[in-house]
Structures are given as structure tokens and as C-alpha cells.
Amino acid sequence: IFNSGKEGAGFEIAELISISRDKKVIVDTSIPLEVLKEISDYDHVAVMLSPQSMSVERFFDRSDPEKQFLLKVIDSCENREEVMLNYRRGLALINSKKHYDEYANSGFFTVVREDNGVDTREEVCDKIAKHFGLME
């Protein structure tokens, strides 16, 4: 699971270079922290964190095409509940305390979302936009 970010990083970096030639680009990436530290600056990276429970239980709440595709595949399985439980276990592993701490202590700008029932999307976007110098 954890090596897939390393394997795909070269492709992601090449694509980012290509699409960012004449414009600013913001992406959700799986480029590993050690690679980001080598190729980027503090003001070009923002780490977004949330409690493990939020990242696991609310993973499919967003309308991202990739997430909805996965949900559709899981829903089509004969043993849907077991498959969903297994998938959530994998998410919990990926979003473990150890990995959370690695990102929290990465040295990059970090935004921590709280699972308090309040919609903070606009506030989070504003913080990130200010960090990237896109707004005052």
C-alpha cells in the first residue's frame, strides 16, 4: 500500500510539470513526503489532516468520481458488508496514528480538520489559499 505513492510519484511529478507550465495548479497527491521535501518549498505544499475516524467513516461522503467508482464496485459485491469492512480496515491502516504523526511533523504547512459536525470547507480553503499566496 505504502509503496504505491513512491511508484507513482514520477508520473505525478511529470504530469504536474506539464500542466503547470502556464498556470498554478493545486492537487491532492500521493507523492511521498521525502520526495516533496526534495522537490518543493514550504509555501508550495499544504498537508491536510483529519482524525482517523473521520477519514475512514466519511471516506465515501465526497462526490469524487474515483471514490464513487470504488463505492459502486463495493456495492456490487455479493458480500458488500464484508468488503466494506475490509476496505475500511485498509483505510484505517493507511490513516494510522503513525502516519498521521509523520505528516503532522513533516515541517510542511498543516491544516487539521475536526470532526465536529461543522462544515469547515470554506475556512480550510481560505487558510490554504493564504498559505499559497492566492489571497491576502
Regions inferred by a protein language model and the residue ranges of each:
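C-terminal intrinsically disordered extensions
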Residues: 41, 45, 60, 130-136
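NTP-dependent small-molecule kinase module
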Residues: 93-136
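A glycine- and Lys/Arg-enriched "phosphate-lid" helix/loop adjacent to the NTP-binding pocket
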Residues: 44-95
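Generic surface-pattern signal
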Residues: 3, 21, 64, 75, ...
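Functionally constrained cores in energy, signaling, and assembly domains
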Residues: 12-15, 50, 55, 95, ...
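Context-gated lysine
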Residues: 6, 23-24, 37, 67, ...
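Alpha-helix-centered segments that form part of catalytic cores
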Residues: 3-13, 81-104
